[in-house]
Amino acid sequence: MKNEGRKRCRLRSASGHPPRVLLVIPTANIIHRHILNGILRYAHQYGPWEFHMITGLFEEQGIRRTKEWGCTGAIAFTETKAHVSAVLAAAVPVIFINPPGTLMGAKSPLSHHCCVIRDHGAVGRSAADYFLDR
C-alpha cells in the first residue's frame, strides 16, 4: 500500500504521551507475525506509538493493568468469547482481527468495534490458482 499524501501523525493524549496500544497477538504463527510486522511498520512510519504486547494467556500477562499503563487503544486476535470480554474490559477502542464468527451478529459485543476478517475462501482459491498455473 502506498501512503502518498499521508503525513506523519503525531498524536498525543491529554497526558502528553503518544498513543499507547495494547497488542494481543500470538506470535507462534507466521501469518500473525506478518500482521504484527505490518502494524509495527505502520507505527514506525506514522508514530511514535508505545506498545504493550500480550502473546499468550491474557490474565498471566497483565491485560488487567491496561488502565495503569494508560492504554489508549488495542489491536487483538481473539478466539473465544472470554478473550473478547477480557479485551473489551480495557474500555478502549479495539480493532479485532478474526474474531469468532459466532460473535459477529448485530447484537454482538463486537458490533461497535472494527473487525478485520480474513476471507479463507479467497485465500484458498488464490493458493489453488497459483499451483494450478504452474
Predicted regions and their residues:
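Bacterial carbohydrate/catabolite-sensing allosteric modules
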Residues: 1-75, 83-134
